Amino acid sequence: MFRAPCHRLRARGTRKARAGAWRGCTFPCLGKGMERPAAREPHGPDALRRFQGLLLDRRGRLHGQVLRLREVARRLERLRRRSLVANVAGSSLSATGALAAIVGLSLSPVTLGTSLLVSAVGLGVATAGGAVTITSDLSLIFCNSRELRRVQEIAATCQDQMREILSCLEFFCRWQGCGDRQLLQCGRNASIALYNSVYFIVFFGSRGFLIPRRAEGDTKVSQAVLKAKIQKLAESLESCTGALDELSEQLESRVQLCTKSSRGHDLKISADQRAGLFF
């Protein structure tokens, strides 16, 4: 007979405890000097709006790193085309010079040595063509190593940013509890996408994902491999930004819904107060 009131008291105590904990909690991913107190209610519009702003800020930073990766891939493609043109030109010069040298040497008995001048010019042209090819290959190796360092820095930065976002999402899902299931599912989907990207960087990075092998370091195959890896990493990060965009849209709709309901409640209270003045 006395169990029902006891359960009610426990439920009220649980709500008060959760509300009190929410008042004192902060977003852990903001860092020192940037922590902000959360709203009084776990599902209030102010708390959702604050979390949405934080999420959009972190999403923008992550998207900026994706743009940097895409720019690196474009630079590698332009470098590959220039190297291809230089190699074709160098090979053509080498072939032309070698042909001229052979013709000059073969005609030297007939021309009494005059064609040796043509042979010398041909050798010079062949040497110049070889120099162009070697210079192009060295430039390709140097640019590959430079772009590789940039990609490694971007990957490390993205990994740190995704860990911050994951801490925010874990905090949000924990305090969302059994509230809006659709919003909670969007948060979990975003967490899964971020976890997959972090594992993608850590797992493949430890096995040479971003570092070409020494056997491939001086070949043109390594550039194509590096470009493919960069594109794969960018696609993985874009899946994270897509999941964060979906969560942000859900947050925006919930904020608007909460705002409308709170306005309607305030209007109803004001109408009741005005009606009470006449009685």
Curated annotation (Swiss-Prot):
Q: Where does it reside?
A: Cell membrane; Cell junction; Cytoplasmic vesicle, Secretory vesicle
Q: Which residues form a coiled coil?
A: 226-253
- Tissue expression pattern: Expressed in neonatal dermal microvascular endothelial cells.
* Transmembrane regions: 83-105, 122-142, 192-212
Keywords from UniProt, A to Z, are: Cell junction, Cell membrane, Coiled coil, Cytoplasmic vesicle, Disease variant, Membrane, Transmembrane, Transmembrane helix
Q: Which InterPro entries match?
A: ApoL
Question: What is one GO biological process annotated to this record?
Answer: lipoprotein metabolic process
The induction field says: In neonatal dermal microvascular endothelial cells, by hypoxia.
Q: What is this protein called?
A: Apolipoprotein L domain-containing protein 1
Recorded source organism is Homo sapiens (Human)
Q: What is the lineage of its organism?
A: Eukaryota, Metazoa, Chordata, Craniata, Vertebrata
Q: Which gene encodes it?
A: APOLD1
